[in-house]
Regions:
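C-terminal interaction appendages of subunits in large macromolecular complexes
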Residues: 11, 23-24, 30-423
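Conserved mixed alpha/beta core segments that line enzyme active sites in large multi-domain catalysts
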Residues: 1-15, 409-410
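Flexible glycine/proline-rich, aromatic-decorated loop/lid segments
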Residues: 18
Length: 423
């Protein structure tokens, strides 16, 4: 960018983009982490603020209950979200959804239907497989990624007799299927970094939007007034057509014709009503053409002089008069300005809003270590020297005549098992 042209510092977003799409980044001495939100909910909150500028954050949260991630999942901790919306900082847990399925053979299957935001599915699957190999998660027989265009689906087939809820807790505890997301709502406000709460985000958006809509309205007003000014000139020339033709035919050059048209005072009987719709100056039945109007008259095509062409000019002037009146109303009234912003937001919501994907719940996340251990029958052995050992029954089997069993326990020298107990 060589600064030879003007470059916009911001884009005229019609909805709170920063909240809807979220943002994350690190700069020198500062960082930001803003989660994405549901478009429809953010617009509802913005409309509520337009209706009541003194609305509290707790009331805004009736419209915006929390972040909404494109990957779905479940947010845990409503109080943490409330803290983030009030102070701009906080950290909440988000977990993927795992459902249970029972197969025809009676075995259980866990299905991961959604994963936390910014978690890589392939990395997650590899991590689960690694934990199975390391026997940190027991009871998993097979893992398959069955995801397609319709959504995420990772099938985890369990071994017979394994408790699905225990495996589910192990997955939450040891993998990224349950992750943390940090609130740090730092944004650039008026050129300076500032940590904003939920209401401040929406207030800053409305302030920005008011400025954009006001500039746009003024631009449209100038454009409409310029067009109406030219049409009035054409209307005056049509009313005085014979005189206009006489001046043009009697001029040696186009410049002479231009000067003569500019210096002539024109009668406006039929055009007076048209003039009064657009211009407020007192004409007293006479009208002076401007340079722009004269240039438009000299470039006028003959087909505009037909009855149809004259009628088109009158119709367009009336439409422009109504448009100019409504634009001036918006510029002079903040209430009308906010009404325009409100209508734009409603149109966007109707066209693009989608249902919420992320659920929000309250839950206790401090897992008891016993909840992550599979329930199974174990063998307790007591030795002569007082050693006690716990082992799985899978390590032993009943030995039949002439058969060979498994070594269930080994003992030290001169020690032996004196008692066994299956529990």
């Amino acid at each position: 960018y060589d600064e030879t042209e003007k470059e916009p510092s911001v884009l005229p977003a019609q909805f709170p983009n920063l909240l809807v799409n979220g943002a994350g980044g690190i700069a020198v001495g500062m960082a930001t982490s803003i989660p994405p939100h549901n478009l429809g909910e953010i617009i509802n909150g913005t409309l509520a603020l337009i209706d009541n500028k003194d609305i509290k954050i707790k009331d805004l949260m009736k419209h915006i209950p929390g972040p909404d991630f494109p990957t779905g999942g479940v947010i845990i901790g409503k109080d943490i979200i409330k803290q983030g919306y009030n102070k701009g900082r906080g950290s909440f847990k988000i977990r993927g959804e795992i459902s249970n399925e029972t197969l025809k053979n009676g075995r259980d299957r866990l299905v991961i239907n959604s994963i936390p935001y910014q978690v890589n599915k392939s990395v997650l699957n590899e991590r689960i497989a690694q934990l199975v190999r390391e026997k940190k998660i027991e009871g998993i027989r097979d893992i398959r990624d069955e995801s397609n265009r319709e959504g995420i689906r990772v099938s985890i087939d369990l071994r017979t007799g394994v408790e699905p809820e225990t495996v589910k807790r192990q997955l939450y505890k040891n993998t990224q299927i349950e992750s943390s997301f940090g609130f740090n709502t730092l944004a650039i406000v008026d050129g300076k970094p500032k940590t904003c709460n939920l209401k401040e985000f929406l207030e800053n958006f409305l302030k920005f939007r008011e400025d954009v809509v006001l500039k746009k309205t003024k631009f449209d007003l100038n454009k409409a007034e310029d067009r109406a000014h030219i049409l009035i000139g054409l209307s005056v020339s049509v009313e005085n057509l014979d005189k206009v033709i006489k001046i043009i035919r009697g001029s040696k050059t186009p410049d002479d014709a231009k000067k003569s048209l500019l210096n002539t005072k024109w009668k406006i009987n039929k055009s007076k009503k048209m003039v009064s719709l657009i211009e407020t100056k007192n004409s007293k039945g006479l009208y002076n053409l401007s340079v722009v109007q004269v240039e438009a008259i000299l470039e006028l095509r003959l087909q505009k002089l037909t009855a149809l062409g004259i009628n088109e000019i009158e119709v367009e002037i009336k439409k422009l008069s109504e448009l100019i009146s409504s634009l001036k109303k918006i510029i002079s009234s903040k209430k009308e300005l906010l009404k325009v912003i409100s209508n734009e937001l409603k149109e966007i919501k109707e066209k693009y809003a989608t249902p919420r994907r992320t659920k929000i719940i309250d839950a206790v996340l401090n897992y008891d270590i016993e909840e992550t251990i599979q329930k199974e029958t174990v063998l307790i052995t007591v030795t002569l020297q007082g050693y006690i050992k716990r082992g799985s029954l899978k390590t032993v089997k009943i030995q039949k005549r002439g058969g060979k069993g498994k070594t269930g326990i080994t003992t030290r020298n001169e020690d032996s098992v004196v008692q066994t107990l299956s529990v």
